[in-house]
Regions:
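N-terminal membrane topogenesis motif
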Residues: 1-24, 80, 84-87, 220-235
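Helix-terminus/linker motif at the lipid-water interface of multi-pass membrane proteins
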Residues: 23-41, 112-114, 176, 236
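Interfacial/gating helices of multi-pass transporter permease domains
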Residues: 32-53, 120, 185-186, 226-231
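Small-residue-rich midsections of specific transmembrane alpha-helices
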Residues: 45-71, 93, 130-136
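Short membrane-interface helical motifs at transmembrane helix boundaries
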Residues: 99-117
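Alpha-helical transmembrane segments of multi-pass membrane proteins
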Residues: 117-141, 167
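Membrane-interface junctions at transmembrane-helix termini in multi-pass inner-membrane proteins
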Residues: 135-157
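Membrane-interface helix-loop junctions in multi-pass transport and translocation proteins
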Residues: 148-153, 163-206
Length: 236
């Protein structure tokens, strides 16, 4: 009964935090529209559409896979198994996301010219491509923290991510973009990318602190690669 109540309050906290962050994000979108104008917003929406497509491909179902496999290991009390799951998920995510990132990087001129129709978006697309593996590795850690029930820490990091994203974006818009739509797109993508890096580093730091407190005991190795592929590939 106690565990059920904890799960309920964790889900409630995560839902409430996500709603609050979405409201803040909507307010920030209003600010952006006033800063970069209709032309900048139009270009930004096109860049974000391409980015979301690439991010979906780069994730390759790894966030859900990390959450599912971590939950299995935590439920069985296999703490070394959790380490193996995270290692396998990191390797899978890095390879998958790097392949997609390279594709976006080298196809960015074609996408900017033929699909978006504006070469000013080229730099923004390449900034996104450079940080795509960081975003996807952050997805692995998010899946782990969700499965491990460490919702409060996850919410705190998500709030930090939002603050960093807005702060870096505002800084770049006010001191560098100077009303240029192409630079404005770079500012927004750059702010989001910097926030993703902060998120990944924060979650890795929290995970390292947890690792130092785990019991040191022998466990029979449980195969991870096959389980990961069975879960991740259908979601890719």
């Amino acid at each position: 009964m106690r565990r059920t109540g904890t799960m309920f309050y964790s889900a409630l906290l995560l839902t409430g935090a996500n709603l609050a962050l979405r409201m803040v994000s909507m307010g920030f979108q209003v600010y952006l529209s006033g800063q970069i104008g209709a032309a900048g917003i139009g270009l930004l929406q096109l860049v974000l559409s391409v980015s979301m497509l690439a991010m979906t491909a780069g994730m390759g179902g790894i966030r859900t896979s990390a959450m599912y496999l971590t939950a299995e290991e935590v439920g069985s009390g296999r703490w070394l198994g959790v380490r193996r799951v995270l290692s396998a998920c990191f390797l899978y995510s890095f390879l998958f996301s790097t392949a997609v990132a390279l594709l976006v990087w080298f196809c960015a001129p074609l996408v900017a010219e033929a699909w978006i129709g504006d070469l000013r978006t080229l730099a923004a697309l390449r900034i996104f491509a450079a940080f795509l593996p960081v975003v996807c590795l952050g997805g692995v850690m998010t899946g782990y923290f969700t499965a491990a029930g460490r919702i409060r820490e996850l919410v705190a990091v998500e709030i930090l991510e939002q603050v960093v994203s807005m702060a870096v974006t505002v800084l770049l818009l006010s001191h560098w973009a100077s009303g240029d739509p192409g630079r404005a797109c770079c500012a927004v993508v750059g702010g989001s990318s910097a926030a993703s890096l902060v998120t990944l580093l924060s979650l890795l730091f929290l995970r390292s602190r947890e690792t130092n407190r785990l019991p040191d005991r022998q466990e029979a190795p449980v195969p991870v690669a096959g389980r990961l592929l069975r879960v991740a590939l259908p979601l890719a």
